């Protein structure tokens, strides 16, 4: 019995890409915020880089990612409900606190 997956099985195992053309601008910005936050956690050294399975700490890049998140959240804040704004503000605070801790 062949244990290697067939091409159709490989296709089924791959995650489906998000169809971004159906997202409005605010949803796109929220997606960017989530992508930037993942990168920020990696750059401040608290998440493993999935490509290398290593911690690749780069605090300068982490700071840029956090600053971009702040800017994006400030830009879309008036279009979000209070719960979503609070969630994003907590994310920013968590990133900032952990960034400072990693600088020590």
Residue ranges with predicted function:
Residues 2-104:
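A charge-rich, low-complexity, intrinsically flexible signal that marks solvent-exposed coils, linkers
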């Amino acid at each position: 019995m062949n244990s290697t997956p067939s091409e159709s099985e490989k296709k089924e195992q791959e995650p489906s890409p998000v169809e971004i053309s159906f997202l409005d601008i605010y949803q796109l910005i929220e997606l960017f915020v989530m992508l930037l936050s993942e990168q920020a956690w990696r750059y401040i050294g608290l998440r493993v880089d999935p490509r290398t399975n290593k911690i690749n700490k780069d605090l300068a890049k982490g700071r840029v990612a956090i600053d971009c998140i702040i800017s994006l959240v400030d830009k879309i804040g008036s279009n979000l409900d209070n719960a979503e704004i609070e969630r994003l503000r907590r994310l920013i605070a968590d990133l900032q606190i952990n960034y400072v801790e990693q600088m020590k």
